[in-house]
Amino acid sequence: MADVFQSERFFREAWPQFSRAFESPSDAASEVEWITGLAALAAGARVLDAPCGFGRHSIELARRGFEVTGVDFSETELERARAAAREAGVTLTLACQDIRDMEFAGEFDLAVNLFSSIGYFSDDEDRLVLDRFWRALKAGGLFVLDTRNRDQIVRSLPPEERKRVNGWTLRIENAFDPATSRWRARWSRIAGPGAARPGPPRGGPDEKRAAGEQLIGESEIRLYSAHELSAMLRPERWSRVELYGGLDGTPFSLDAPRIVLVARK
C-alpha cells in the first residue's frame, strides 16, 4: 500500500516549491474549453475543481462565467490560487480540505479531477474519492477525470527528467514497480553550471547526493489502467461513460499519454 503520509507531506512541503514549473496557461485554457464544450454548461453553472492546486483550471473556468469551488489540502497552493484569481479579476470559492473528506451533495453541474490527482491513497480510498465526486454532482452533471495512462508510461518512463525552475534545476529520478503498479519519484534541487544536463544513472536510494544537490521530497502514485479506473468509477450508476486519450478529445489507445474518463450522472 502507498505511504499515504509520505504523499501528503510531499504535496504540502515539496510540491509548492516547483509546481509552477508545470504551469501552462495556454494548455489550461484549451483544456477547459474542451471540457466545458462537452459539459454544455449554462451561464452561472457551478463547478468543482478538486484538487485545484494553484488554480490554473479554476481561473479559466471562472473566466467563462461559472461559479467555481476549488478544494486542495495545501494552504500554500490555495494562497497562490487566491493571488492569481485577484490578478485575473475573477472570484473563486476556495476550501482547504482533503478530497477524501468532501461532503458536497448534489451541488455541482461539473466536477473535475485533473493532472494525475488520483492514485495517492490506497485503492479503497481512491474509490471513496470517486464516490465523493459522484455524490457532489447534480443529476445530469458531468465528471471529468484526467490522469497518466499506465499502459503507456510503463513503456516510456525515463529514468531521469530535468526542468529549470527559477534559476535552478529540478531533477526527477523515476522508478516503476510493475508488481504494484506504483511510480516512485525522487525530486531534487541542483545548483551550479551544467545542472540542466542529465547525468549518469544513480545507484541505490540512500546514496549520497552530489555536491550542490538537495533532496526536496519523494512521491509515490498508483497508476491505473483504463479498465481498472472504469471499474472503480462504478459505471452502472452513471448514465454515460466515455474514454479519451487527452483533454482535447484525442481517441484513447495504449499509446495515449493520458486517460480521460468523462461520466454523466
Feature locations, PLM:
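A short glycine-rich, Lys/Arg-flanked "PGG" loop and its adjoining helix->strand segment in the class I
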Residues: 127-139
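Class I SAM-dependent methyltransferase SAM/SAH-binding core
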Residues: 56-101
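Residues lining the SAM
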Residues: 114-115
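C-terminal lobe and adjacent flexible extensions of AdoMet/dcAdoMet transferase-like proteins
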Residues: 224-265
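A short acidic, Gly/Pro-enriched loop at the edge of an enzyme's catalytic core
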Residues: 103-110
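Conserved class I S-adenosyl-L-methionine
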Residues: 1-42, 44-53
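SAM-dependent methyltransferase
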Residues: 124, 144-232
